[in-house]
C-alpha cells in the first residue's frame, strides 16, 4: 500500500503522473517500496530514476526503462519528486557501504544537496526517517517536504484498500 499512497500523494500535489520525473534514492536492492513504486510509476507514464551506492542499485532496472545513477546530484537534479528510502542499519554489517556517515555524505539530502534540486520538487520518505542519514531535519521539515501529507494520505488509502478487500458492504456510515 505504500506505493499506492506515494502515487496518490504525487498525483494530489503534481496532477498527472504521466511525464512526471521521479527519483528514488537509497537501498533499491532490498526495498519493496522502491520496486512497487517503480512498477506503478512506469505503468502510469512517469520517468523513474534510481540512485544510491552501486551495490544497492541494481543496473538491471535499466532493462525496464529506469535510469540508474550512483551519485545524488545526477539522480535528483531534474526530478519533480524525490523519494528517499530508509537505510536499514543491518545493511552496515553486509558492507554495502562503509558507514552511515559515508552514506549520508554522498547520498543524504541536506541543505547543500538541495542546491541541485528543482525549487518545486517534492521531497518524500516512506518513514521512519533516519534524520541526518537519508535527509536532514531542515529538508524533512522544509517547504518541499510532503512527508506529513504522505502519512495522512496513508491512512485514507489503507482504509480504502481494506474497504475494497472486505467485499460488499451494505451500509457505509
Enumerate the language-model features and the residues they cover:
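Catalytic-loop motifs flanking and including active-site residues across diverse enzymes
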Residues: 2, 33, 157-158
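A glycine-rich, Thr/Ser-enriched phosphate-binding loop motif common to dinucleotide/cofactor-binding enzymes
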Residues: 1-9
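Glycine-rich phosphate/diphosphate-binding loop of Rossmann-like nucleotide-binding domains
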Residues: 11-85
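Adenosine-phosphate binding glycine-rich loop
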Residues: 120-173
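Catalytic cores of large soluble enzymes that bind and process phosphate-bearing ligands
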Residues: 2, 102, 106, 153
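Rossmann-like adenosine-cofactor binding region
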Residues: 61-138
Amino acid at each position: 500500500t505504500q506505493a499506492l499512497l506515494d502515487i496518490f500523494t504525487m498525483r494530489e500535489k503534481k496532477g498527472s503522473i504521466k511525464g512526471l520525473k521521479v527519483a528514488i534514492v537509497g537501498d533499491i536492492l532490498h526495498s519493496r517500496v522502491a520496486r512497487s513504486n517503480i512498477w506503478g510509476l512506469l505503468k502510469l507514464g512517469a520517468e523513474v530514476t534510481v540512485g544510491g551506492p552501486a551495490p544497492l542499485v541494481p543496473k538491471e532496472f535499466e532493462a525496464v526503462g529506469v535510469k540508474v545513477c550512483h551519485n545524488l546530484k545526477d539522480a535528483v537534479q531534474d526530478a519533480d519528486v524525490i523519494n528517499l528510502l530508509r537505510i536499514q542499519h543491518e545493511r552496515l554489517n553486509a558492507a554495502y557501504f562503509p558507514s552511515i556517515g559515508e552514506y549520508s555524505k554522498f547520498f543524504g539530502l541536506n541543505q547543500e544537496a538541495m542546491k541541485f534540486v528543482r525549487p518545486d520538487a517534492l521531497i518524500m520518505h516512506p518513514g521512519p526517517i533516519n534524520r541526518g542519514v537519508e535527509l536532514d531535519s531542515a529538508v524533512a521539515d522544509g517547504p518541499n517536504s510532503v512527508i506529513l501529507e504522505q502519512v495522512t494520505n496513508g491512512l485514507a488509502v489503507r482504509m480504502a484498500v481494506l474497504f475494497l478487500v472486505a467485499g460488499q458492504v451494505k451500509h457505509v456510515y
